Regions:
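Conserved AMP-binding/adenylation subdomain of ANL enzymes
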Residues: 178-196, 206-247, 262-263
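N-lobe entry segment of adenylate-forming
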Residues: 1-51, 71-72
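Conserved AMP-binding A3 loop
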Residues: 31-35, 148, 155-182
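AMP-binding/adenylate-forming catalytic domain of the ANL superfamily
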Residues: 482-506
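AMP-binding/adenylate-forming catalytic core of the ANL superfamily
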Residues: 249, 374, 379-380, 399-484, ...
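Adenylate-forming
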Residues: 117-120, 229, 246-293, 306-315, ...
Length: 518
């Protein structure tokens, strides 16, 4: 048994607490004690070990107790696990099934476990990948002589975001995953005896999976809601935090911004127990996060709980994290007469290191590409024959700088927009444009043209939800000029949901640029 599976087994079997899952159909919470979840994991491992040939295991479906147990079940069986998203609303079921099974097959998955309607959709597709009923597997009889399998060297095949290019698969070892989880537990001072976790994050995303595993390894109770339940009604997140009296939660900037923006609709919630609210997975909007903290203060939310962080799938998840109680700290810089505010994202967790390296692009003093290394790093990308050594520095593609050892991220190097010699990061423009009436929140992309640096033009694409396109377009241009000090060459308004996104919801800026420029 690998070190991660052993640590998971010890935590689950010894915990007096439970996994509590929201059933989206009945809208009720269902509790399953952690020892019972591990019992299902052993059953799933027994089912997997009955197969003549066993490669990596794929998981697709709502986050039921059985699906969560299957993650540990794969590790007990000595194989890696990979999770992929359910079909999006409006997707053709057959096309989704074939695409998903091709993706699984391409990374070495030969057995997929699923349940419900997704199981039936996958089973109807023609594929060499074996499709198994997750619910039945969780009920497989086990003998006291179940033999845990040796470490395969791979725990997770984790898809990367692909927001600036084609998604790749990071190969994560059991030791790397365990190191990352322990680093988080140490930094956040998580205690299974007193902490309670609540999440709606997708488990196929590195932040959602890391949140789950950190909660399990600390031995705390976890309330897990399907991502679709949040998407349908984002303000329910506040209700779930109140109902669970959670002390620990996490979400992308978008989630906090939605609650802050529509806080007038929040009623009768108690957020007084919450001591850690991680904001990660996408650039932190300081104004939006502050708006959330201020709006939720009457409901007991403490500003010290705001925890902006930095991470990536290639490092399992977390790279930097503030210490408990630091709250949202902001660094202000003035460049070309324009003031910018950036969140401090904390220092590296135990086992991780970072440095700022020089880039080819002109930049302010101390600003450069973030490079990382450490015990949480991936073994490499699947199929990459070049490999990497443990001590190698990994270039993240993110541009940032340090403030007293705390990391600040400005943006992605591939996405920098250069206008008249000035470097502009897309989020600076997007966060300002998103505040205009008629623009869908979280539906703005700023890109530069393909021209040379001196002649580059700023282009903005925004999803339109207003009444008058001309009024909204003019308002976006005026606000960007006023706040950012740059004039957009064009503002393209698009139907809601039309901007391309990754499976985790991140906007694909480079694809938007290709569309706008033909």
């Amino acid at each position: 048994m690998n070190v991660l599976a052993a640590a998971m087994r010890d935590a689950m079997t010894r915990s007096p607490h439970a996994l509590v899952v929201l059933d989206k159909d009945s809208d009720t919470w269902r509790s399953c004690p952690w020892p019972e979840v591990h019992g299902m994991a052993e059953s799933i491992a027994a089912r997997l070990l009955q197969r003549d040939r066993l490669g990596a295991v794929g998981l697709v479906g709502e986050p039921t107790a059985e699906l969560i147990a299957a993650i540990q079940g794969a590790w007990l069986a000595g194989v890696a696990v990979s999770l992929l998203p359910r079909p999006r609303r409006g997707a053709d079921p057959s096309e989704w099934a074939h695409s998903t099974l091709r993706r699984f097959g391409g990374i070495g998955v030969d057995t997929v476990l699923s349940h419900g309607g997704v199981l039936r959709t996958l089973a109807a597709a023609d594929s060499t990948v074996s499709i198994c009923d997750l619910t039945q597997a969780a009920r497989t009889p086990t003998s006291t002589g179940l033999e845990y399998q040796d470490d395969s060297g791979v725990a997770i095949l984790q898809g990367t975001a692909g927001s600036t290019g084609n998604p790749r698969t990071a190969v994560l070892s059991p030791a790397a995953v365990l190191s990352n989880m322990r680093g988080l537990i140490e930094r956040l001072r998580l205690d299974g005896a007193s902490d309670r976790a609540c999440s709606w994050l997708p488990l196929y995303h590195d932040m959602g999976l890391a949140f789950l595993l950190t909660s399990v390894l600390s031995g705390m109770p976890l309330w897990q809601a399907p991502t679709g339940a949040f998407s349908a009604a984002p303000l329910r997140w506040a209700e779930w935090l109140s109902d669970s009296q959670a002390t620990f939660t996490a979400g992308p900037n978008f989630g906090y911004s939605m609650i802050g923006r529509y806080s007038g609709r929040v009623r009768d919630v108690d957020l007084g127990a919450l001591r850690i609210a991680i904001n990660g997975g996408e650039p932190v909007d300081c104004e939006g996060f502050q708006r959330f903290a201020t709006a939720m203060a009457p409901f007991g939310f403490r500003a010290a709980a705001a925890t902006p962080a930095y991470g990536m799938a290639e490092a399992t998840c977390a790279v930097t994290m503030p210490f408990c109680g630091e709250g949202l700290q902001i660094d202000e810089r003035t460049e070309s007469g324009v003031r910018q505010r950036y969140a401090l994202l904390g220092r590296p967790i135990a086992g991780m290191q970072l440095r700022i390296a020089a880039t080819d692009q002109p930049s302010a003093e101390g600003v450069g590409e973030v490079e990382i290394r450490g015990s949480s790093m991936m073994t490499g990308y699947l199929g990459d024959t070049t490999g990497r050594s443990d001590g190698d520095w990994f270039p993240t593609g993110d541009i940032g700088y340090l403030v007293d050892g705390a990391l600040v991220i400005c943006g992605r190097s591939k996405e920098v927009i250069t206008v008249a010699g000035r470097n502009i990061f897309p989020t600076e423009i997007e966060q300002v444009a998103a505040q205009v009436d008629g623009v869908r929140h979280g539906g703005v992309v700023a890109v530069g043209s393909k021209s040379g640096a001196a002649q580059s033009r700023l282009l903005i694409a925004a999803e339109f939800v207003g009444a008058d396109r001309n009024v909204t377009r003019s308002a976006v241009i005026k606000r960007v000029i006023s706040v950012c000090g740059v004039t957009p060459a064009d503002v393209v308004l698009m139907p809601p949901g039309s901007l391309p996104r990754t499976s985790s919801g991140k906007l694909r800026r480079l694809e938007v640029r290709r569309q706008l420029l033909g």
